A protein has these predicted regions:
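Short hydrophobic, aromatic-rich alpha-helical segments embedded in or entering the lipid bilayer
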Residues: 36, 213-224, 300-304, 316
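Membrane-water interface segments at the C-terminal ends of transmembrane alpha-helices
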Residues: 2-33, 44-158, 186-206, 234-253, ...
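Peri-membrane helix termini and adjoining interfacial loops of integral membrane proteins
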Residues: 27-38, 110-123, 212-218, 258-267
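Glycine/proline-centered hinge or cleavage motifs at structural transition points of membrane proteins
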Residues: 171-172, 185
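Glycine-rich helix-loop "coupling/hinge" segments at transmembrane-helix boundaries
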Residues: 107, 203-229
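Juxtamembrane helix-boundary/capping and inter-helix hinge elements in multi-pass membrane proteins
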Residues: 78-82, 158-163, 173-176, 227-231
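Feature of multi-pass inner-membrane transport and sensor proteins
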Residues: 161-162, 177, 214-218, 247-281, ...
Length: 336
């Protein structure tokens, strides 16, 4: 018994050390003497990094919270055409990495992409730079990461107390009022958990922000290390990123408090039946999100793949597939 206890403690300690060691390393960078490069970053780039990162987090956070919660409520609480298969289809964007979705939308909606070409030639709409501003990158992150909030909110809605929902219905509350005043407050802990994961993913992303030429802490860390060859400044910037991550975790725990994610009441709620036009409007909304976040990008990837494979297929693609498969398998085994 003691031997098993010590073995389990050893592996837990090893895991904790593996997580804590990189944090300790980047934190210890502040003990090093200051450099002119850090002063340059702090005076010229740091305010821009903080502003752009904050705008990105606020935009993505608000977007995934609203979209993920609304989608979860619709598939759980409302009966509409296509509900049964759309409920699981909304998880499929998990299978497309964020940078891949960004690459697809840049290829389609960039100035030379066929979407802008069609808009200019047939509708006379002038060209625009999809990389300018914040809206395009925020929408990309929302389409990629909304499943985190959707997954958590959906599970919460399925386990909410039937008595409270039914009481609201009996008192004559309309579905939208039940949603805002009963269902959403009860699901707040789950929504906060999904939001936390989303913000952490957004904060750590490098591929999407690089494709959009958007300045965040991750691009600054890479620039400090790769362009300026300064590991010290890169570590100091990374420590600020870790500090923001700790703040997000603390904020999520405070927002959740001691609230429960689910109720022990497992009675099934009776879904609202959306009749006629309303049901089809809901269907096209949910289906549209599925198309934008998964089906259309996947179709575009397949089209590009077939074009490439038909002209330059070679054995190196088998190496790419095998390497990806091995890494996926090993990561899955180690994680589980």
């Amino acid at each position: 018994m003691k031997e098993a206890f010590f073995k389990s403690n050893f592996w837990i300690g090893l895991l904790a050390f593996s997580v804590a060691f990189p944090i300790f390393v980047v934190g210890s960078s502040w003990l090093l003497p200051g450099s002119e490069l850090w002063l340059h970053f702090a005076q010229t780039l740091l305010p821009e990094l903080i502003t752009s990162t904050l705008i990105l987090l606020l935009g993505v956070g608000a977007g995934v919270s609203i979209l993920g919660t609304v989608l979860a409520y619709l598939v759980v609480m409302v009966e509409f055409p296509g509900r049964s298969w759309l409920e699981w289809a909304l998880f499929l964007p998990f299978g497309i990495p964020a940078y891949v979705l960004a690459f697809v939308y840049l290829g389609v909606f960039d100035y030379s992409g066929y979407a802008q070409v069609w808009l200019r030639e047939y509708l006379g709409i002038p060209g625009f730079d999809i990389r300018s501003g914040h809206w395009a990158i925020i929408l990309t992150f929302i389409l990629v990461f909304y499943p985190y909030v959707y997954m958590m909110a959906r599970a919460s809605f399925k386990r909410q107390k039937v008595q409270m929902i039914e009481a609201g219905k009996m008192l004559g509350a309309k579905p939208i009022r039940v949603f805002w005043q009963i269902s959403v407050p009860l699901a707040r802990p789950a929504i906060a958990a999904g939001l936390l994961v989303t913000l952490m993913e957004t904060l750590a992303d490098f591929g999407v922000v690089s494709l959009f030429n958007y300045s965040t802490f991750t691009t600054a860390i890479y620039s400090a290390w790769g362009d300026f060859r300064s590991i010290e400044v890169a570590a100091q910037l990374a420590s600020l990123l870790v500090l923001v991550s700790f703040f997000l975790i603390y904020f999520e725990r405070k927002a959740r408090g001691k609230a429960k994610y689910y109720s022990s009441d497992v009675s099934h709620l009776k879904a609202y039946y959306a009749k006629g036009v309303v049901g089809w409007i809901i269907f096209f909304f949910v289906f549209g999100i599925f198309m934008l976040s998964f089906a259309m990008p996947l179709l575009q990837i397949l089209i590009w793949s077939l074009e490439v494979f038909s002209t330059e297929w070679s054995k190196r693609y088998f190496n790419y597939f095998s390497s990806s498969g091995i890494l996926t398998f090993l990561a899955t085994v180690l994680t589980v």
